[in-house]
């Protein structure tokens, strides 16, 4: 089991390639069978083995073991199987030790170990040992590195997001760790030079936008749907419009500014434009649409003017490609819906002119 964990971990000191595929597949299937049938004595023996190999700085002499350890945790503690308090404490020390290495691979490996701990440990153990705070403070330092790969960026922010569930005194009204993350994410998106990284960061901004909602799982499912289908977009739009977006109130102006700054990337390739625009659409649905216009109207005229102009420029640059035209039309429909949905209230005077303008654009695009 220990050997298979080292061989199948990626990357490892053995550089075990993914071909022939039958070999790696057989190894993984065998490993899954033996890890799920582990009993107490086997677990104790494995724990003792890793304790000897990965104690303090000794992990640097056992590179295979440290990669194998992360693989073992992922396979051994899955589903309803939770880590013991002893394994939780040991995994924390291993994660902290490997992250002292300057190599980004080991910082990412440490974040992976932390994420496995946060997902597969007893919440009571995590909170009593204050594990989540230690991990958050350690990993948040990586959030300032804007040159990471998409994989490393995803590992960092996934780990930080998992920490939030264990802060029992956190609420949506007071400034909290969620706000610190949004501050850094918005900053990183604005200075990101790669579309793929921007898309990755935007997804986490969107997730934080509905973190405090009671129907978080429902919103997760709706946002994961294919929103190019009108009926699914309608369900998603209605659900997002009813969100209680107290956190987004504080960030609405900066999120709108971020979307305008990012819109320049929409003029790149058709594929990049489509993916980024769809992610912007989800972000707008969650973070901006639920906010009452009376609280938002001071920021919207500038956003409408600049952002819609870029959307129209996209159509010209990409020669009205259907994969670009569809999300552009959807965005314009959402902006129009936002204005029309305030019909029960008096529409702010500085927004009244945009209602007819957006309707005209929608009709023009439909031709």
Residue ranges of each PLM-predicted region?
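Extended alpha-helical scaffold segments
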Residues: 2-77
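Eukaryotic acidic, Ser/Thr-rich intrinsically disordered low-complexity regions
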Residues: 332-367
């Amino acid at each position: 089991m220990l050997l298979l964990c080292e061989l199948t971990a990626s990357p490892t000191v053995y550089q075990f390639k993914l071909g022939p595929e039958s070999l790696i597949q057989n190894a993984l299937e065998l490993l899954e069978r033996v890890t799920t049938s582990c009993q107490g004595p086997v677990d104790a023996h494995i724990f003792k083995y890793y304790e000897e190999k990965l104690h303090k700085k000794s992990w640097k002499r056992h590179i295979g073991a440290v990669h194998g350890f992360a693989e073992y945790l992922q396979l051994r503690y899955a589903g309803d199987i939770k880590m013991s308090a002893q394994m939780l404490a040991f995994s924390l020390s291993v994660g902290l030790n490997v992250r002292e290495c300057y190599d980004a691979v080991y910082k990412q490996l440490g974040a992976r170990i932390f994420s496995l701990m946060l997902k597969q440990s007893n919440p009571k153990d995590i909170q009593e040992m204050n594990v989540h705070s230690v991990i958050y403070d350690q990993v948040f330092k990586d959030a300032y590195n804007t040159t990471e790969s998409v994989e490393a960026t995803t590992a960092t922010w996934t780990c930080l997001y998992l920490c939030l569930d264990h802060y029992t005194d956190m609420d949506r009204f007071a400034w909290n760790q969620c706000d610190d993350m949004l501050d850094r994410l918005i900053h990183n998106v604005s200075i990101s030079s790669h579309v793929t990284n921007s898309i990755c960061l935007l997804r986490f901004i969107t997730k934080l936008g509905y973190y405090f909602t009671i129907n978080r799982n429902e919103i997760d499912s709706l946002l994961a749907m294919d929103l190019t289908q009108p009926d699914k977009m309608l369900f998603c739009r209605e659900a997002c419009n009813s969100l209680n977006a107290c956190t987004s109130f504080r960030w609405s102006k900066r999120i709108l500014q971020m979307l305008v700054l990012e819109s320049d990337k929409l003029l790149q390739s058709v594929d990049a434009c489509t993916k980024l625009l769809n992610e912007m659409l989800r972000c707008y649905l969650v973070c901006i649409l639920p906010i009452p216009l009376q609280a938002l109207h001071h920021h919207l005229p500038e956003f409408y003017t600049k952002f819609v102009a870029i959307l129209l420029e996209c159509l010209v640059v990409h020669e009205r490609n259907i994969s670009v035209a569809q999300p552009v039309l959807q965005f314009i429909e959402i902006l129009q819906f936002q204005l029309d949905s305030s019909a029960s209230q008096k529409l702010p005077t500085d927004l009244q002119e945009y209602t007819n303008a957006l309707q005209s654009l929608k009709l023009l695009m439909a031709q």
